[in-house]
Amino acid sequence: MIKRYLSKSLTISLRKPKRTSHSACILLLACWAATLPAQKISLDATIYQGSIWRHSPKLTTQSGERIGGQELGFRFHTTGRRDWQAWQHYPAFGLSLGHFRLGEGSHSDAFALLPHLSIPLFQTGRWAAHFRVGTGLAWVTRPYDWFDNANQNAIGSHWNNITQFRLGTEFRTTSHLRFSAGGSMTHFSNGGSALPNFGVNVFSGWAGAAWFLQPLKKEDFQPAKTSKREVLRRFGGQIQGGLALLEIASLDGPKHAVWITSANGYFQINRINRVLLGMDYESNRAIYEWGLHSARFRDEAKARQGSTRLAVFAAEEFLFGDLSIVLQAGKYLGKNINQFVPKASYAKLSARYYFPALLGTEMKTFAGISIKAHKFTAEYISGNVGLSF
């Protein structure tokens, strides 16, 4: 079942939920479900209090007011049944339903389905600290509308991506009950698939409680049987192709393709960590069409040149079994290309699922999604397929 879902190519246009937003959600859930060999489950409840950050002077959406949110979910806690779980200090995979009351001046309410990964940072006695990252699907009740909601320009569609980073400490009171608190940043955006798309960034504090259906004891954690330093091959490469859909310049206008290709080499630090160095190439049809129709490019040759984007990037890939998270930073380069880029540099956050090795070799295909941003504004969300060798 998982392979059947993952074999479908993914294009993300959050304005069209029946076709692509559902595909993105299926991919995220399939990646998450494929990495759940653990048996220890906790039920989690969280409340949030924070405010929307005014990250752009062009933002007309209300910001700075106190807002709140709630979250209910569950986590599967790994116990070392596979060596990588011990190497990664026994992470937890979870799924949550969330709600943020953004306010009447800020698109009203946001409801979210959020798969997430919790990574332990340290544990001593009854205390522990965790970092959590998640990305999923959100529904915003009152997006921008030319007739009914023209004064709120952060989000231009009902369907959006939600990406959240959360840091917190946890205190174990009994074998079943734990309390936690910390801080978080939650981002809502459609990745430019529907304008306007400045996005909503919520910075908040949070407090929560977790009830373990079965006690999670120290003796439940199995040590790794092998060393994470035993790497068969230190150097390798990856190639990847992707597709995103964008609106540009005109609200409710046509959507244009952004074709993305990347190639990189990598150095395998250990069996759960890689450093990547490579190049990104993009053919941005949104810039091409907009530049021609607005006479910013005098002919098709200039339009092709101006809509080409080339960049070098460095990245780090964190491996969790067949799932990985890639943090990437890039810088544009080249003369007479990269026209109309918002900034000189960008960042990407990617999630990948690796399929079994091909024909007994080291080669593995993968599928995933990426969100690309210039500072705190997302440019696009893409679906990707690639090969690691």
Feature-to-residue mapping (PLM):
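Outer-membrane beta-barrel translocator/channel fold
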Residues: 41-60, 81-87, 107, 124-171, ...
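Outer-membrane beta-barrel "beta-signal"
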Residues: 72, 201-222, 349-351, 378-389
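Transmembrane beta-strands of outer-membrane beta-barrel pores
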Residues: 47-53, 76-78, 97-103, 135-141, ...
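Extracellular loop and loop/strand-boundary signature of outer-membrane beta-barrel proteins
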Residues: 57-60, 100-103, 149-155, 190-197, ...
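Residues that define the transmembrane beta-barrel architecture of outer-membrane proteins
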Residues: 64-70, 89, 107-113, 127, ...
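Gram-negative (and chloroplast) outer-membrane scaffold detector with strong preference
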Residues: 90-141, 209, 267-269, 273-337, ...
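Membrane-embedded beta-strand positions of outer-membrane beta-barrel proteins
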Residues: 43-47, 93-95, 131-135, 167, ...
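Short loop/turn motifs that connect adjacent beta-strands in outer-membrane beta-barrel proteins
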Residues: 39-40, 79-90, 122-128, 173-177, ...
